[in-house]
């Protein structure tokens, strides 16, 4: 007798199944169940056709799924707990694509060195791996690969119910420049101005300090060149020259970048 458990649709909420079946582009499903307060969530990217084909099997695992997002016609994102049977279902085609909550260094991914994988734009795509070994590796690196509840809000605003903390975060977005139309990954750009002396320090020798800031925060940090040629007075007094820095990313990475910059400048009394 087979050990596999077949999905039992008669035990499922048919309205819920229909809602997921008819999920439109740009829409999302939010699970109203209560999840553990300190839970970590994987954000998995799937082909919509695969999700639709295996819909009943996914519905069997709804108690492990916090949200389902359909950003476009071809793609579904699933925010779920780190649960072996659900991940095994997703890994049916021997491909697992994980959307990461923040920048991850190659050092953090060393556990996958014996695995065929690609890492680009905060997406980890794993292919042709033994599932049991893969699951162990993911559990080992859960703190790097998974979202906290707070990070889920930063990248998927409507997955969580509204509360005072969320409202404060939403107010803060009015103070930054949005990066084009509203996006599901909630990327924003913050513009700050520093003087030339501070900028020179932040860049560091051969750009090493600014690269370290980018790597640690996960934010994109761009220094806008000064458009006008500096006068002799300005060259002798660089602290009088203002220069712009653009910091792009989610609120978490931007806050981390700004805090790191402020800390570095305060330490040297700049």
Swiss-Prot record:
Presence of keyword RNA-binding: yes
InterPro entries named in the record: KH_dom (IPR004087), KH_dom_type_1 (IPR004088), KH_dom_type_1_sf (IPR036612)
Example of a GO biological process term: reciprocal meiotic recombination
Keyword Ribosomal protein: no
Domain KH: 191-225
GO molecular function, one term: mRNA binding
Induction (UniProt): Its expression is meiotically induced and required the IME1 protein.
Keyword tags: Meiosis, RNA-binding
Gene Ontology CC: nucleus
Function: Required for chromosome pairing and genetic recombination. MER1 may function to bring the axial elements of the synaptonemal complex corresponding to homologous chromosomes together by initiating recombination. MER1 might be responsible for regulating the MER2 gene and/or gene product.
Name the record gives this protein: Meiotic recombination 1 protein
């Amino acid at each position: 007798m087979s050990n596999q458990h077949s999905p039992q649709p008669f035990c499922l909420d048919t309205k819920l199944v229909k809602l997921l079946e008819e999920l439109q582009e740009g829409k999302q499903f939010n699970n109203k169940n209560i999840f553990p307060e300190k839970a970590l969530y994987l954000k998995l990217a799937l082909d919509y056709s695969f999700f639709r084909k295996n819909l009943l099997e996914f519905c069997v695992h709804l108690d492990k799924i916090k949200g389902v997002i359909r950003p476009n016609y071809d793609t579904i994102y699933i925010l779920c707990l780190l649960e072996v049977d659900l991940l095994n279902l997703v890994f049916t085609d021997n491909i697992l694509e994980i959307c990461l909550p923040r920048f991850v260094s190659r050092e953090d991914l060393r556990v996958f060195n014996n695995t065929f994988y690609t890492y680009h734009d905060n997406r980890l795509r794993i292919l042709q791996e033994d599932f049991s070994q893969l699951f162990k590796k993911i559990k080992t690196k859960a703190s790097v690969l998974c979202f906290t509840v707070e990070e889920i809000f930063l990248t998927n605003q409507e997955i969580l119910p509204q509360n005072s903390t969320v409202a404060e975060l939403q107010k803060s977005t009015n103070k930054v420049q949005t990066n084009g139309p509203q996006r599901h990954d909630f990327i924003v750009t913050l513009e700050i101005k520093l003087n030339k002396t501070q900028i020179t320090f932040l860049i560091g020798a051969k750009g090493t300090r600014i690269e370290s800031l980018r790597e640690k925060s996960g934010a994109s940090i761009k220094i806008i060149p000064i458009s006008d040629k500096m006068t002799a007075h300005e060259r002798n007094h660089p602290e009088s020259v203002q220069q712009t820095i653009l910091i792009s990313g989610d609120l978490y990475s931007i806050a981390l970048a700004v805090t790191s910059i402020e800390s570095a400048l305060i330490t040297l009394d700049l």
